[in-house]
Amino acid sequence: MTAMRTISEPENLALGSSLPPGDPHGVSVHLPKWADTVGWASRELRVLEAMKTGYPRFFVPRVVDRLATLLLERQKSELGDRGGNEKQAILLNSAQHARLCREALRRLSLPLERGEPPDIGVYIVTWEGRITPVPPEGVTNHPWRARAVGEEDILLVTFPVDIYLAAKAFWQHTGFGVSSRRAAYWLDNAPFLVPDVAPKALTSPAERVKQLNGGLDALKKRIAAGHSSPSDNLLVSLSDVFLFPAGMAAIAQTAAAIKCLRPEDSPSPPRVAVFGFLYVDTNKVLSRVLGYEAVQYHSTPASLDALEADLEASSRATGADPTATSKRLDLLVTEFPGNPLLQAPDLERLGRLARKYGFALVVDDTVGTHANLSLLAHCDVVCTSLTKMFSGACDVMGGSAVLNPASPYRDRLGRALECGRAEAEERAWFWEDVVRMERNSRDFSERVHRASENARRVAGMLRRSESVSEVYYPLGSPTQDWYDRYRKEDGGYGYLLSIKFKTPAQAVAFYDALDVAKGPSLGTNFTLCCAYTLLAHYRELEWAAEYGVVEDLVRISVGLEETGWLEERVGRALMAAEKLDEARG
C-alpha cells in the first residue's frame, strides 16, 4: 500500500507534536490528555506554546504566518502604511476567494469605533514581489498573467487587528487559505524573499505542468469511477468532477454557485436547510460567509415530517402570492452518515422532496466514502473532504464536488462551477499538494475496507463494555436500514465511531488511557481519537447537547493497524473506565 503509514508507539508522542510525527505538513496535532483538549479549546498558554502545528483551517500553519508577515511588511513599505502596525493579513489562493473574503469581513465585522466600515485591502503579490492593490470591482476582473506552475500570484488580504477574529473565522470556515507547501515554496524560492541566496535547482516548469495536469487527471478519473454506479445507470465523466484545495472549499464554492442560480432581483436571501447535526464549519460557511438563511432540522423522521410540512406551507404561500418568496428553499445539505453521531438520513425521501419543491440536494460523504456507498444517483451533488480517508496520510488538504449527470441542476450548476474550474484547480490548489494527494489516494478503496473492518471490531468491543452507554456507528444503529440501502456490495460501515460513556469521568479516563494518536481530523491511516465536542463546539456546548452531541463525547477514527494492536489498546482504556465504575459501586 503506497499510503499506509501508521504510528507504532503513539504513547511516546509529546503534547503539540505534529501528526504524522515530524511532518512539516501534518494536518493534525497530538493532544494526549483530556485536559490538553480543554486547554486548546480555552486557549490555555501551556497548550498553545506547545503546539508545533494544528489542523490547518483551525491553526494557521506557522510557515504561512511567516510568509503573511513578510508580505504585509512589504505591502506597507511599498504602498504606504495605511493604519500602521494595526493591520494584519491572511493569504488566499485566488481572486474569487479574495472577493468572498472582502464581502464576508464587511458583513461580519461591526463598524470600527470611528463609525467607518473596516478598511479591507486586497493586493496581488507576484512571484517577483510586485504588489498591486485591487479595488472591490476589480477583484474578479483582474487580467491574470499566465504564470509558471508554482509561481502563481498570491492574494494578500489586509484588515484592522480588531477584526482579526472575523478574518480567522473566514479562514477556518472556507478552506481558502494558502497551504503550508505553497508558503514554504515561496519562502524558499521566490526571488524577492531569497535575493542573496543562489537559486535552488527547481523542478522545471514543463515538469511541473506535467505533474499538475497528470495529478488532476488521475484524481478525476479515480473519483469519477468511484461514484459511477452501473446498478443506477449512472456514468460519471471527468467533466462532472470539480477539485478544490480543501473539503470546505468544495462545499463553499458549490453553495456559492447554487446561490448564483437564483434570480438577480430576488427580494429575499437564499435559504438552506441543514438536515442533521453536520460538521461544525458547514453550518457556518453557509450562513456567516455566504449569507444563506439557515434552517436547522434534526436527522429524525419527525424532523423530516416537519421539513415537508414547511416546504408545503411555503409552496402554498407562494402559489397564493407569487411575490411571497421569503420561505422558498434553495438548498438542502446533509451528511451520509453524519459526523459525529453517524446517523444516516432518509436520502430517498429527501430526494423526492428536492424534486417536488425545486431545491438542490447536496450530500457530504466524507465519512461514508464512495468506496462503501453509492449516493450520487440519489442527490444533485456529492461533496467530499479528500483530506480525510481519500488521502489517509494526514499530510495534504483537498476537496471534491461531483455532479450527478442526471440531475436537473447538472447543466446550470455545471456552467457556474466551470467558470471557476481553472482558477480552483490550477491556481488555488498548489501543484505539490495535487501530486501528494494523487500518490496518497492510489490505494484508497483498499484502505477504506481495512479501516471499516477494524472499526466494526472496535465498535463491538465498546458495545460489550459496562462503562459505555452508547456507541454511534452505522452498523447496529437505528438508521442502519437507510445506510444499507446505499451500501455497495463489498462496502462496509465506515471507519468512524463515537462513544457516550455512562459518566463524564469514565470518558476522561478512557481518553487518557487510550494509547493512540489524539487530535483533530479523521480518516487517517493511523487511529486518531478526539474529544470531539470540546474541539468543535467548546463555546456552544448547550446547543450541541440539544442534538445529542454531549460535552464528553469521544470520537475515534479507526485506522489500518493490526487488529490485535487495536484491540489490546482499546481494551486497556476500557479497563481504566470500568475501574471508575467499580470504585463508585
What does each model-found stretch correspond to?
Residues T2-A249, A257-P263, P270, F275-V295, ...:
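Conserved N-terminal alpha-helix of the aminotransferase class I/II PLP-enzyme fold
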Residues G26, R43-V47, K200-E207, A416-A509, ...:
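Structural motif of enzymes handling amino- and sulfur-group chemistry
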Residues L216, K220-P245, R316, G460-R463, ...:
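Hydrophobic, structured segments
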Residues S237-R464, Y472, R584:
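Conserved PLP-enzyme active-site core in the AAT-like
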Residues Q480-E489, A531-D552:
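Active-site-adjacent capping/gating segments
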Residues D512-E542:
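Conserved PLP cofactor-binding pocket of PLP-dependent enzymes
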Residues R569, A573-L580:
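C-terminal alpha-helix
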